[in-house]
Amino acid sequence: MGFKKLVSFQPDYVPQYHITKYISERTKLQLVHINHKTSPLVHGYFAVPTECLNDSGAPHTLEHLIFMGSKSYPYKGLLDTAGNLSLSNTNAWTDTDQTVYTLSSAGWKGFSKLLPAYLDHILHPTLTDEACLTEVYHIDPENLGDKGVVFSEMEAIETQGWYISGLEKQRLMFPEGSGYRSETGGLTKNLRTLTNDEIRQFHKSLYSSDNLCVIVCGNVPTDELLTVMEEWDNKLPEIPSNIPKKRPFLDNKLSHIPQSRDKVTESTVEFPELDESQGELLFSWIGVPYSDFRNDLAVDVLLDYFTDSALAVFTRELVEIDDPMANSTDCCTDYFMRTIIDLRIQGVPTEKIAATKTKVLEILKTHTIDLSRVRQVVENTKWEYLLNYEKNGESRFSSAVITDYIYGNEDGSSLVSSLKDLSDFDALLQWSQKDWQSLLNRIFVDNKPIIVTAKPSALMYEQLEKEKSDLIKQREAEFDDEKKLVLLKRLNNAKNINDRPIPKSLLQKFEIDNPSKSVEFVNTKSIATVDSYKYNNVSDPLTKKILETRPDNFPLFIHLNHFPSQFIELHFLVNSASIKDTSLLPYFNMFDELFSMPMKILDEESNVETMLSFEEVVAKLKSETIDAQINQGLKGSCPDLINFKIQCRAGGYSNSVQWIKHCLFDMVFDENRVRILLENYLNSIVEWKRNGNVMLSSLTNRNLYSARSLKKSTDPLFVEAKLQEIFAEIENGNFEKEILPRIETMRKQLRANFNKFHILVLGDISKIDDVYEPWNPLIKCLNIAHPVEKLKIPPVPRALDTISSICRTPGEKAFIITTPASESAYMNLITSIPFNLDYHDPEYAIVSLASEYLECVEGPFWKGIRGAGLAYGASMLKLCEINSWGFNIYRGADIIKCYEVGKQIVQDYASGALEFDEQLIQGAISSIINRLATIECGYFETALSKYVDEFCLQRGNNFNELYLERLQNVTKTDLKNAMQKYFVNMFDSNKSVAFVSCHPAKLESVQEFFETQGFTVEIEELEDDDDEIDSEEDENA
């Protein structure tokens, strides 16, 4: 007996993938192999359908405890430590109806070593009380606050408006006894009382081979995969064939979802926030059954029709209007037994909530579907679907497989129906207007919604603060010094047991010989249209054709990257340094909306100019491209490049190029359009201020960069006052006189320096008829004189040229921003490491490896900070482009202790009190290799990565190879020297700058702490919408 093949098929639209589904005849375990060769990574998704009938958090806490050891490998962190050694990365998520464990490996060799151990952890975890204490919840013996990794994670989101409204929706939509009703992450009040016995019982009830689906995606030999799986499966207890397979949710009649709802149910909830200016609305409907794929797709199309793009009905009626009723509309679906459809209306002025709610229902009831537009949405959705599957097939396919495993047919037939072809798209293109109108009425009108209004409440904010204060006072009365000592001993005992060293001999089984040579990276072909490019392979027919057909005096630099694809991705990169007046840079927040502005079109034969409305422009853009956007930088590098990014079908290259010309010359900054979009942007800042991590990034960027940098000059908090002034000017009738000339000056300066344009074309270049001819209209408009100077590779703007004085010489300052709507704290500690953009500096590999050693899973920061429940994450910031390095805390429960523990760890390695572990060093190197493979996980990603390495960072297209060689040569002495020379500086107030985002209740203690550390503290408080935010002084600019 072994694995029986259930189905095997090749999706018509992405033939590079082949999907085969098996079932173990012994144990009923299911295995799905998604075979393809388009990535160096092998991905694993190990899915357990998990139904929980309460808010205890048992599914989520169990997910965390799975990683704390198994019966065969009874050591906390073995899975992650072994993962480091085997070029692998592990993770997991818990959702309402599933818990999924993931494994990502750079190659099959490491994956195959770790797979049996991982599955052993899932089905046979140790689930010790000690692991539960540190990982889930405990009381801090010193300050009597709440700690624990899971607790910290849930505390960070539990007071957010979206979370509270989502939970209320579940309560109203599903009855008592339904698994869909529960908060599987665990409410914090329940995490305090959840016992390990309850978690063990939950595992016993659901974690078995007949409720586990193992999904493996990548370049994996089928016979080897089956051999590994059969060897492991044979060790499991047999499940007799007469015992029905577990089907959570399907087996529970109370979890069955009715076909529809016959009445509207409404509720209002509050979330704690000092700024009471904006709330949000959540509408939720019951959709179609899982197996009704065509109608489910049709519902998705309708949701896009109503919410996606400037043409969307809700966008036109609620958002992009005078005196807007909302900042944005968004939709999502939960693929349960029946689809649950959520529509969120965000950034609703609190005084307009009732009117907005009425307006949404009225639109749905009275709107007449535009057949031509809905068919265009179907067409766009189809090509977006294809592009997503080509770029992220493993993620898309695995998600579909997981849903089918929970709700589909056991024989695999429903999986084939859902993924085999695109016939549902073709069928929807034939639907009549009546068909679409009928669907709209059936799902969104006759079928009644749940409506949840989420309102911000300053009173609730104060009440919660009082409750927390009262809880601490109650504990202070309850826990005298003796009881605190008991807590401390119990916690220290748990840490000692959890941190038992893993035998070196056991870890050696997971090591990979010569890891840097064991990964097969994806290859693409680079072609640059300049003679000086040394990597052009002139013997290659395609390269030869491209170079030979280049017109004389062609003035633009084009770099092409060729690989198999149905699509072209165009990046037109403009150097923002061309904008001489830095006061113009905040106008980028209007400039990036160019793709949705009106456009003038000149008929060259009649010399008659016509104007397309913005609606006509967006419709035309949608018909000629798949996606178009304007943003900053390229793959996280060179943030001062303005990137016009267009994705299109392979035959759409010529039209896409014309859109670049349209943006630079033809788009019209219409006064009404600019005013509406600007007002929407300003209103959206309220929502950003509620996110502690976003505010940390803002605080950091506004101080590390000068106003010359887009990082600072487009930051929402930095530009808020400036954009409010601009908006006031428009309201006062000064658009034509004051505002438009400045925007046009910015555009004129950007397009003037054509020799600074970087043009990057990715995809199947052989499908482009003529690379050069489509650029002629733009070249003509640029009025480039001929002959031009010999074409050279253009320079790129260096972020290092736009840094502030405090970034150049950090010291003494600590900046704190308070975020009332965010319970968790976030921190960056920044110091200087002056590599001066030389990635070949001998110390670069040393510092990189030292960083990875500290932050890798089960490394020092992981054990000392996350493992102690002090924060959800602790990592290193590698800001090499601005000569900076740093220490980051994400979702901190105790930011002060995070600082202290991080400082102690670094100092101990610098002094020699802690010795570097050879296996952990090798694990850190393997983690870096895995990250490189993840960065280059497909053709498009590889092509972008090559371009960044070669042209943006200027470190050569073979940098990774040289870098990995250097990593292997780093010694323990090198690492210790790096700690002494650089890393201790992060915690030295004379050589670092600190940035903290925290709740106002923590401000006083955090401020006092940083002052005791020698920092001068500057505070920025976010409260209500009327409070002004002081910008930094010019000397930091």
From Swiss-Prot:
GO cellular component, one term: cytoplasm
Residue ranges the record marks as coiled coil: none
Domain of life the protein comes from: Eukaryota
Single GO MF descriptor: metal ion binding
Other known facts: Present with 8120 molecules/cell in log phase SD medium.
PANTHER family listed in its UniProt record: METALLOPROTEASE, PUTATIVE (AFU_ORTHOLOGUE AFUA_4G07610)-RELATED, PRESEQUENCE PROTEASE
Name of the protein this chain belongs to: Uncharacterized protein YOL098C
Origin organism lineage: Eukaryota, Fungi, Dikarya, Ascomycota, Saccharomycotina
